[in-house]
């Protein structure tokens, strides 16, 4: 307000400068806050099934892909890396998961590489994180896969509590019970003071797996 400016949300990658989607200043407040808006004019954005490559119907989660003037031609002198993200139809695969709604707005829901595969079930950490944020006393939460001898991976929740709050693992599981699918309820629950971060302040989600193994060892928790 001090700068007499209105804020919109823009989603994209360095490889899709200046972006892939954006909301408009005249969009409703909930659209500007809860989505990343429409695709840019003269570009194509689609949500595809990572396993089949087919375009997902409205409301179904898949990988965000982009084609158009805003898509890079390739990585400098690195054709192998280019081939990993640009397909034969010149669509760039972002690695991000998203959903397109009935109004054509997109919502980012997570990262493919963060997906937890538990006994053949695909579990998206962000879904569980958003659910656990509703638990009173939770300040911040991250969910990651912890290696499992039986299932390949199990769900691990790393929780930062609000100041002065005391909570037990049983409190978290009781909150989840009968509200989310049983296989999505965290097997391992860790109360931590901070998350591993980059120098720029981004959470290093890939390090949570190692942190979980370390905490299990320190606390005498058997990995099943």
Where are each of the predicted segments found?
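Gly/Ser/Thr-rich phosphate-binding loop
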Residues: 1-31, 44
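AMP-binding/adenylate-forming catalytic core of the ANL superfamily
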Residues: 12, 68, 73-74, 81-84, ...
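Adenylate-forming AMP-binding core of the ANL superfamily, especially NRPS adenylation
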Residues: 30-77, 85
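Short, glycine/acidic-enriched loop or turn micro-motifs at the edges of active sites
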Residues: 15, 52, 99
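Acidic/polar alpha-helix N-cap and adjacent early helical turns
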Residues: 210-224
